[in-house]
């Protein structure tokens, strides 16, 4: 990143997709026309996953005249050794076949980039950092971030510091841990217990007309789990300021409606940046 070239090639790797785009570090804006999305099967073999991941990087470089040796910031789910680029993901229902691999080296070879120019950041930390860089913290000295999707992401930002992964997904809760009660597969399991097959929350919500009582019960229970976790996180970090994102957060108004008084005790903002937040946060590693 130089004065003449303020762009960083940023990517957000999720459980079902990878999105890459150029971020202008002068304005901290994503260059929308540079954005490339590519689906990925997180249960595929390692070679197939890495090949799928590399596609949007190469397309952005080819389509947008990014530098031949670009700076690359990647928002990556955990567990992951972010400093050394080694995947520790296992038993997460995604990317098990990458366990122990040097992702920095593998991607560098496929993209045609220099390994030293690739940096990784936890996806939840990237999300929160991006929201902060976009000015969404409203002057608060400390803000918590939660991402709800195929996994549970948590992060903490304090003024003067970068956002850090809070790593609370494995917090003991009920019969397992917090993540197992707050992510997409929870909705799949709960619906299955009622003889309903869905792939996630969106399909479940579409059944409210035909299975109103069942869907309402599932949503009510999820709302309770979410409130419990927000309360736990807030008390742990001694702040009531939170920003929540991820695909599940799009149904925030529904979850809040089951107990608005309890939720409104916290200052909660729902991300309006979407995946742009993680892209900006990934690029911010080079700020």
Predicted regions and their residues:
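Conserved phosphate-binding loops in N-terminal lobes of ATP-dependent enzymes
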Residues: 3-78
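Feature marks short, surface-exposed loop/turn motifs that line or immediately flank catalytic pockets
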Residues: 17, 78-82, 152, 250
